[in-house]
């Protein structure tokens, strides 16, 4: 094991997820999840050596309290002195950051400037960052942005067809998300296939409760489905994905809904949950669809159809298709969705290998198309925490 470990933090508005990683081996020595932050019943759960235990945070139920509890846990296991640097996931770096960066006052001001682009996430990231700076004194902090990988998109891909002063004044454009995952998976795909990533035209689908898809050529993002916010694009667990923007005026007029209510509905009550009326969990949707539930069947059909349509358009953005890559919780585990999506893609020369598709689950990478396919479809597990740890170690000089 390398001497210095990396602490990776991912702060949400009411949660904090943390992991201590050995950057060399990728081994996770300790992980934690703080929930219900800023509520009286806040708590943090630690997992070490497969054992879990819960710590009450009611005396100090905020992000600082969670980081303090994490420090105590690290001390209890003799890990505190081995932490060399802290890496933070940050949702939006806007157009300011095209790569990960070592934190200073200027970077904190930059993250603050991007708050309008991620009003729920960036303030929470800043709380976690400040807590880490005050509790882990003298340790370098690095921020890794979800948006930075997509800063290579050409103007035709990131601009919206609206008056350009809206872009100039307010930064209204496509930013995308899941960039850290795409960067990791693009590297891993090239390694797995024994190719240089610059020679591969990839379409990568990151499918989880939040889902997006990206065209990668020459190792760079060329286009992506998420937009100004993560609401655009694919059908997701609770998000609608693409929808006619006139829905705001229509529902305001006919359903007497406010902008806030419509935004909440499109983000939290739509997608698989809204269509099925059952659940946002893809596993539940698959099970119920198999039993004949009409709503679940329609939700699954729409998810698969939208994804297949987007794969076609992203192949255009990539300039062709050498590798279709599935990642994320659904992408890595749902052989049903992968098989049905590839069923739409015969015109791209892709044919499913059913046995290989069944094997490529539960953390197993694998090619899932037949040898005579014109391109490969491959399953590659993502590891955003490890990517953040790599960046943090590199920028901290560890």
Swiss-Prot record:
Cofactor binding annotation: Mg(2+). Can also accept Mn(2+).
Predominant subcellular localization, coarse grouping: cytoplasm
Catalytic residues as annotated in Swiss-Prot or TrEMBL: 146
Protein name according to UniProt: Acetate kinase 1
EC number: 2.7.2.1
Superkingdom field: Bacteria
Cofactor(s) this protein requires: Mg(2+); Mn(2+)
Location(s), subcellular: Cytoplasm
Pathway: Metabolic intermediate biosynthesis; acetyl-CoA biosynthesis; acetyl-CoA from acetate: step 1/2
UniProt keyword terms in alphabetical order: ATP-binding, Cytoplasm, Kinase, Magnesium, Metal-binding, Nucleotide-binding, Transferase
Site (Transition state stabilizer): 178, 239
Classification lineage: Bacteria, Pseudomonadati, Pseudomonadota, Betaproteobacteria, Neisseriales
InterPro entries assigned to the protein according to its UniProt record, in alphabetical order: Ac/propionate_kinase (IPR004372), Aliphatic_acid_kin_short-chain (IPR000890), Aliphatic_acid_kinase_CS (IPR023865), ATPase_NBD (IPR043129)
Reaction(s) catalysed by this chain's protein: acetate + ATP = acetyl phosphate + ADP
UniProt record similarity statement: Belongs to the acetokinase family.
GO CC annotations, alphabetized: cytosol
GO MF, one annotated term: magnesium ion binding
Its job: Catalyzes the formation of acetyl phosphate from acetate and ATP. Can also catalyze the reverse reaction.
Enzyme class: transferase
Binding sites annotated in the UniProt record for substrate: 89
Alphabetical list of Pfam families matching this protein: Acetate_kinase
Gene that produces this protein: ackA1
